[in-house]
């Protein structure tokens, strides 16, 4: 059935259709509803996400006050680049997207069959679906991991393990070329699965998640639009140029190139990406604006809760 183009298209279409149906029953974001002046709807949505037994009155009041203050000055695309805080946030979001794409995730997924052939891996072409399964299953578990682990830690571990995997594959490729590699053809497949698993655990979802965490509500939509467009432009460019890189430096060096960029990505995270878990939107934005406030004992709106909403 899958070999039939019509049935294959129907199978692929079933997934977005399922998402469409599911989203019909999903409440709107409390932050968005509050920004539209729909107080009662925002409260109902937040109660849906928090659970009936949780007290949300303090969080609703804090959210209402913050959004009212942030929405006083709505910005245009041009004005995004006029404030220190939004410029820093754009640098962080653009940087994360750059290193996410420069890890080579899309070329590896799209050219998996050709890559395995370069490694002399004798597998059924359909076996490359294992990589897709690793991506989907790891993404599911990462949603639970994001609730307990810090963003920076996940990004650093994710980039490091991706670099280690790709670097190991590059070494393995050159060992194979010199006829000194082990005969176990499952090594490349297993290593690629590790690469994809750690991508899905951090580098994949966190740059998108942080878009809702590092920008004020009044600029989030425009900043997200710019960043998303930049992301897909990079995805197209890296995927398009991958074959040229392979032709120029062969598969082993190309994977090594991606590994080096993953290392640089981890350095970028260490020095430039702030921790956002367990912090309020105001605290994060104050950091970008260079404002230092005295810590007070107050109710904290966890950023991840808003982004999940």
Language-model regions: role of each:
Residues 1-49, 68-309:
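Alpha-helical transmembrane bundle of multi-pass membrane proteins
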Residues 56-68:
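Short, well-structured alpha-helical segments
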């Amino acid at each position: 059935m899958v070999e039939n183009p019509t049935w294959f298209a129907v199978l692929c279409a079933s997934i977005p259709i399922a998402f469409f149906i599911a989203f019909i029953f999903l409440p709107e974001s409390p932050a968005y509803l509050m920004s539209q002046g729909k107080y009662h709807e925002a409260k109902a949505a937040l109660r849906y996400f928090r659970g009936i037994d949780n007290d949300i009155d303090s969080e609703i009041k804090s959210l209402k006050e913050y959004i009212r203050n942030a929405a006083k000055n709505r910005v245009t695309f041009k004005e995004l680049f006029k404030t220190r805080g939004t410029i820093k946030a754009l640098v962080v979001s653009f940087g994360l997207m750059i290193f996410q794409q420069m890890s080579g995730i899309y070329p590896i997924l799209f050219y998996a069959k050709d890559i395995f052939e370069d490694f002399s891996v004798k597998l059924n072409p359909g076996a490359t679906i294992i990589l897709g399964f690793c991506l989907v299953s790891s993404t599911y578990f990462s949603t639970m991991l994001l609730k307990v682990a810090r963003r920076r830690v996940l990004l650093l571990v994710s980039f490091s393990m991706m670099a280690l995997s790709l670097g190991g594959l590059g070494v393995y490729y050159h060992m194979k070329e010199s006829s000194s590699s082990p005969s176990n053809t499952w090594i490349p497949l297993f290593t690629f699965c590790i690469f994809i698993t750690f991508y899905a655990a951090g580098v994949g979802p966190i740059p998108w998640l942080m878009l809702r965490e590092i920008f004020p509500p009044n600029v989030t939509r425009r900043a997200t639009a710019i960043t998303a467009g930049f992301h897909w432009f990079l995805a197209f460019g890296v995927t398009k140029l991958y074959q040229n890189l392979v032709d120029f430096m062969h598969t082993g060096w190309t994977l090594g190139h991606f590994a080096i960029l993953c290392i640089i990505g981890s350095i970028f995270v260490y020095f430039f990406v702030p921790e956002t878990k367990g912090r309020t939107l105001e605290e994060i934005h104050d950091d970008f604006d260079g404002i230092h406030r005295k810590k007070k004992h107050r109710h904290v709106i966890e950023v991840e809760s808003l982004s999940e909403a």
